[in-house]
C-alpha cells in the first residue's frame, strides 16, 4: 500500500475498472427488488458546474447505498440536448448546432466519469438523436388522433428580433432573455397539448404523493388553480351577443357596476365604438409590450380605456360600461371580469381612478358601509344588502342560493374553472423535434403517416443570426407531397418545445434500445415508477407537471400502466459563494475541473455532501474543501498504520473482548445504525459523514492498538469506516478495501450489518441536580437500580457540599437521565 494518498492515481484506476467490468450495468431481474434512482438530466452546455457536482453526488450516494443493500439499481444518465442555446452557439461560432451539441456531450460525459458517478452508460440517450425523437413524433400523432394535440390561434410572447415565440420563463422584465429586445404579444397559430383534459386528475394526485415536498405540491395545486363558481352571461346593449364571465363571487353580482375585458379578448375591438377606436387600439398596443406576469402584480398601476359600449347586469338590469383593463388576462376564466368595486380591491382602485359608480351589496354585521367614504374594498364575509330576495343572508351561505337562482333563470350556470391553460408546444426554431404535420391547400393539415416517420431534422440549414426559423429556408425539407391527395404540400416548420423531450425520457431509460415502439411495456412495468427523483425546485410547475401529464397520456395510449412517474422527489438547494448563487455574471464560479485536478473527485464529492443537508443551500468554503481532503488523508494514514496489525487478525469473538475492545465495538455499531438511518430515512448525508468522522477519532485514540487480542475488533472498525464512506468517496474506499485484502468490490461486499447487542451501552451518564441546578454527573451501570443510582448521587463528592446540613425532602429520578435532590 502506498504511504501517501494520491487521488489522481487511485481515481483513474477505479474508473477504468468500473468501465471495463460494466460494474453499474442494470438488467431486469424479477427475483430482486428494484430501485430506480434518477437525477434530472442536464442540458449539454459544455461544462459541468458545482451545482451538477452536488446534484449528481447526492444521487450517487443513494444509488451506491442501495446497491450495497442488495437492491437492483437503475441509475442512468443522458442529455436534454435540443434548445435555443445550440442555435446561438452556431451563430456565434459559425458551426452547426449538432456539432456543438455532440462535442459538448462528449466533454461532459468525460467530466461525469471523472466524478466516479455510478451510471449505467449503456442506457445513455440524447434527445437530439433521431432514435429518440422519432418515437416522440409517433406519440404526437397518437395524441393528434385522440384530440390531445391541436392547433389554435393564441396570444404568445413574441420577440421581434429573434422572430420566435418565447415561453413565459424566457421573458425577463418584459424583454427577451436572449437579445434583450422588448417582447410583444402576438396572435399566432400554435400547436398545443390538451393538458387541461387532465387538470382534475393532476390535481387529485397531488394528494397521493407523500414522498414529494409539500412546497412543490402546493405550487402545482396553485398553478392548476381549481376554483368553483358560476359562468354568467351579460347581454350587450343593442346586440344579440353576450359577454360570458366566470366568477367565484356570485354573491357580489348585484354590486357589479362595470365590465373589465382583457385587451386580448376577442370582443375587444368588436365592442369599441368608432369614436373610441384610436384610443383603444393604442391602449392594446401598449399592453402588448407589457410583461404578462407584471400586469397582475399588486403594485402594478391599473389602467384602462372605455370601449364606448355597455352591457347589462342580468339581475339588476343596470347598464355597465365596458372597459379594457391592463390587469385582466385571458389566461384565467373567460378574459372578462364583472367588476364589483366595493368588494374587490383592484376594481375599487380602477373605479376611483375612472370615476365609475359603486354600490355596496355586502357589509359587516351591524355596520353600514358608504361607497363615498370607503378607503378600501370590503372583501370579507358579511350580510347581503341591496341584493333583492337575498338581503339579510350571510354572503357565504348566499353563494349556493344565488348559483341555483342563476341556473333556474337561465342567466348562468355552476362551473369549475382552472387557472391551468393548454400547453403551447410550437417553437419557431431549428434545433428541436420537427412536428410531424403537412399542410395541403386541398386537404388542410394532414398528419405524416406513421410509416413515413421519422421526420428527420435536415443538417443543411444555415444560421445567419438574422432571426426567423432556419427551417423555413430549407426547401428540401419544406417542400413535400400530401399523403392524402399526392399534390404539392408544405411541412410544418415549427419544432416542439424542449419540455416535451424531458416529459418522458425517464420512461425511455427503461428500454433505450427498444426498436418496436417508444416503450417496452414489460421493462417499464419492472422499473417504473422512479423511486427517487432529484432536481431543482425551479422545475416545480413546468417540467414536473408536464412529466406527470405525459405519463398519464402514455398510460391512456396503452404504452405503460403507471399513474405517476416519480414516487419520491428531492429538491436540492443551490451552491452559494460570496452570498450569491454561483454564476459567470457574478464572477463567483468554482471550476469543478480545477477542484478535481487539485484534490480529486472524492474530495469534491465529500465536501458537497458534508457542508449542508441536500435540501438546503450549500455555502462554498475553500477551508471546507481543504478540511475534506485532510480527513481523507487521515483515514488513509489510519489504514496504512494499522494494516500490519490487522492483516493477520483472526475471527472476532465478542465474548473475549477487553473493556476497551467492547467500547470500540459499541461505537462502531452505533455509527452503523446512525449512518444507515441518516442515509435511508432522511438523506442527512452531512450528519452521516460527521458520525463516521467521530468513529475515526475513536479508532485513532483506541489503545492498545498493537494488542493481538484487539486486532479483530480493530479490523472490524477499520472495515466499517471504509464501508460507511463507500457511497460518498467510492474511488478512495475501493482502493482501501482492496488494500485490506478483500477480493470482492464494496458493492458486492454489501452494507455493514448492525449488531444491536453490540451497540447497547453498559454504562449510562446520569446528571445530578440539587434543587434543579446542575451539581454533578454520574457514570452508572445500565443495570443499576433506582435505589443504587439515588445512593450514588447522595454519596457523590461534588454533590455533598450542597446537601450537608440540609433536610432532603425528596429525590426525583428520571431513569437513565437525571437525579434531582430537593433539599430544604
Swiss-Prot record:
It is found in: Cytoplasm. ATP binds at residue 584. GO terms for molecular function: aminoacyl-tRNA deacylase activity; ATP binding; leucine-tRNA ligase activity. The gene is leuS. A motif ('HIGH' region) lies at residues 42-52. The keyword Ligase applies. PANTHER family: LEUCINE--TRNA LIGASE, MITOCHONDRIAL, LEUCYL-TRNA SYNTHETASE. Its main location: cytoplasm. One of its GO terms (biological process) is leucyl-tRNA aminoacylation. A motif ('KMSKS' region) lies at residues 581-585. Keywords: Aminoacyl-tRNA synthetase, ATP-binding, Cytoplasm, Ligase, Nucleotide-binding, Protein biosynthesis. It holds the Pfam family Anticodon_1. GO terms for cellular component: cytosol. This is Leucine--tRNA ligase. It catalyses: tRNA(Leu) + L-leucine + ATP = L-leucyl-tRNA(Leu) + AMP + diphosphate. It comes from Geotalea uraniireducens (strain Rf4). Belongs to the class-I aminoacyl-tRNA synthetase family. HAMAP family: Leu_tRNA_synth_B. Its EC number is 6.1.1.4.
Amino acid at each position: 500500500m502506498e504511504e501517501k494518498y494520491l487521488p489522481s492515481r487511485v481515481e483513474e484506476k477505479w474508473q477504468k475498472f468500473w468501465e471495463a467490468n460494466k460494474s453499474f450495468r442494470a438488467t431486469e431481474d424479477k427475483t430482486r427488488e428494484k430501485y430506480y434512482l434518477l437525477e434530472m438530466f442536464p442540458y449539454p452546455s459544455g461544462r459541468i458546474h458545482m451545482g451538477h457536482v452536488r446534484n449528481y453526488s447526492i444521487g450517487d450516494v443513494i444509488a451506491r447505498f442501495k446497491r450495497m443493500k442488495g437492491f437492483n439499481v437503475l441509475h442512468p444518465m443522458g442529455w436534454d440536448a435540443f434548445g435555443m442555446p445550440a442555435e446561438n452557439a452556431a451563430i456565434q461560432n459559425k458551426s452547426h448546432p449538432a456539432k456543438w451539441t455532440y462535442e459538448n456531450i462528449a466533454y461532459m460525459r468525460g467530466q461525469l466519469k471523472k466524478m466516479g458517478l455510478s451510471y449505467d452508460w449503456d442506457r445513455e440517450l440524447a434527445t437530439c438523436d433521431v432514435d429518440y425523437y422519432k418515437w416522440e413524433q409517433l406519440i404526437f400523432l397518437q395524441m393528434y388522433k385522440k384530440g390531445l394535440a391541436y392547433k389554435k390561434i393564441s396570444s404568445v410572447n413574441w420577440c421581434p428580433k429573434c422572430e420566435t415565440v418565447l415561453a413565459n420563463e424566457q421573458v425577463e422584465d418584459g424583454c427577451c432573455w436572449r437579445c434583450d429586445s422588448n417582447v410583444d404579444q402576438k396572435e399566432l397559430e400554435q400547436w398545443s397539448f390538451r393538458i387541461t383534459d387532465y387538470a382534475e386528475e393532476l390535481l387529485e394526485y397531488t394528494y397521493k404523493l407523500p414522498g414529494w415536498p409539500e412546497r412543490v405540491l402546493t405550487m402545482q395545486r396553485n398553478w392548476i388553480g381549481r376554483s368553483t363558481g358560476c359562468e354568467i352571461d351579460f347581454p350587450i346593449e343593442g346586440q344579440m351577443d353576450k359577454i360570458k364571465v366566470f366568477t367565484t363571487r356570485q354573491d357580489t353580482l348585484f354590486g357589479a357596476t362595470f365590465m373589465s375585458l382583457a385587451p386580448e379578448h376577442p370582443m375587444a375591438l368588436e365592442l369599441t365604438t368608432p369614436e373610441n377606436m384610436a384610443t383603444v387600439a393604442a391602449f392594446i398596443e401598449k399592453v402588448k409590450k407589457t410583461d404578462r406576469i407584471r400586469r397582475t402584480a399588486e403594485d402594478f398601476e391599473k389602467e384602462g380605456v372605455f370601449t364606448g359600449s355597455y352591457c347589462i347586469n342580468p339581475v339588476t338590469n343596470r347598464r355597465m360600461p365596458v372597459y379594457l383593463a391592463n390587469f385582466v388576462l385571458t389566461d384565467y376564466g373567460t378574459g372578462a371580469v364583472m367588476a364589483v368595486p366595493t368588494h374587490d380591491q383592484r376594481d375599487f382602485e380602477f373605479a376611483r381612478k375612472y370615476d365609475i359608480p359603486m354600490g355596496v351589496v355586502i357589509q359587516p354585521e351591524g355596520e353600514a358601509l358608504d361607497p363615498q367614504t370607503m378607503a378600501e374594498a370590503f372583501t370579507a364575509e358579511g350580510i347581503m344588502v341591496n341584493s333583492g330576495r337575498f338581503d339579510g343572508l350571510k354572503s357565504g351561505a348566499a353563494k349556493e342560493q344565488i348559483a341555483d337562482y342563476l341556473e333556474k333563470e337561465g342567466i348562468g350556470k355552476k362551473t369549475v374553472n382552472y387557472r391551468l391553460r393548454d400547453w403551447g408546444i410550437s417553437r419557431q426554431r431549428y434545433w428541436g423535434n420537427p412536428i410531424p404535420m403537412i399542410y395541403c391547400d386541398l386537404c388542410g393539415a394532414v398528419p405524416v403517416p406513421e410509416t413515413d416517420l421519422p421526420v428527420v431534422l435536415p443538417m443543411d440549414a444555415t444560421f445567419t443570426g438574422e432571426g426567423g426559423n432556419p427551417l423555413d429556408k430549407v426547401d428540401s425539407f419544406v417542400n413535400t407531397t400530401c399523403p392524402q391527395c399526392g399534390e404539392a404540400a408544405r411541412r410544418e416548420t415549427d419544432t416542439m418545445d424542449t419540455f416535451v423531450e424531458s416529459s418522458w425520457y425517464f420512461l425511455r431509460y427503461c428500454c433505450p434500445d427498444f426498436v418496436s415502439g417508444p416503450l417496452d411495456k414489460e421493462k417499464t412495468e419492472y422499473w417504473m415508477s422512479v423511486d427517487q427523483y432529484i432536481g431543482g425546485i425551479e422545475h416545480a410547475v413546468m417540467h414536473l407537471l408536464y412529466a406527470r401529464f405525459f405519463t398519464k397520456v402514455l398510460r391512456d395510449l396503452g404504452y405503460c400502466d403507471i399513474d405517476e412517474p416519480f414516487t419520491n422527489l428531492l429538491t436540492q438547494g443551490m451552491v452559494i459563494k460570496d452570498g450569491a448563487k454561483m454564476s459567470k455574471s457574478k464572477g463567483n464560479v468554482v471550476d469543478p475541473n480545477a477542484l478535481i485536478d487539485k484534490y480529486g473527485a472524492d474530495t469534491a464529492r465529500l465536501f458537497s455532501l458534508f457542508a449542508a443537508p441536500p435540501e438546503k443551500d450549500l455555502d462554498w468554503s475553500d477551508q471546507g474543501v481543504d478540511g475534506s481532503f485532510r480527513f481523507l488523508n487521515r483515514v488513509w494514514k489510519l489504514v496504512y498504520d494499522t494494516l500490519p496489525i490487522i492483516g493477520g487478525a483472526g475471527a472476532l469473538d465478542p465474548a473475549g473482548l477487553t473493556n476497551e475492545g467492547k467500547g470500540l465495538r459499541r461505537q462502531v455499531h452505533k455509527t452503523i445504525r446512525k449512518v444507515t438511518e441518516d442515509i435511508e430515512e432522511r438523506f442527512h448525508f452531512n450528519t452521516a459523514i460527521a458520525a463516521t468522522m467521530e468513529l475515526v477519532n475513536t479508532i485513532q485514540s483506541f489503545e492498545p492498538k498493537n494488542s493481538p487480542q484487539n486486532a479483530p475488533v480493530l479490523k472490524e472498525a477499520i472495515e466499517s469506516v471504509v464501508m460507511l464512506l463507500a457511497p460518498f468517496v467510492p474511488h478512495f474506499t475501493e482502493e482501501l478495501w482492496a488494500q485490506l485484502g478483500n477480493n470482492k468490490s464494496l458493492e458486492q461486499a454489501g452494507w455493514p450489518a448492525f449488531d444491536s447487542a453490540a451497540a447497547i451501552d453498559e454504562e449510562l451518564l446520569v446528571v445530578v441536580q440539587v434543587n434543579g441546578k446542575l451539581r454533578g454527573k454520574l457514570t452508572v451501570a445500565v443495570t443499576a437500580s433506582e435505589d443504587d443510582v439515588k445512593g450514588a448521587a447522595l454519596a457523590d463528592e461534588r454533590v455533598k457540599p450542597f446537601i450537608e446540613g440540609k433536610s432532603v425532602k425528596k429525590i426525583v429520578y428520571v431513569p437513565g437521565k437525571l437525579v434531582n435532590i430537593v433539599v430544604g
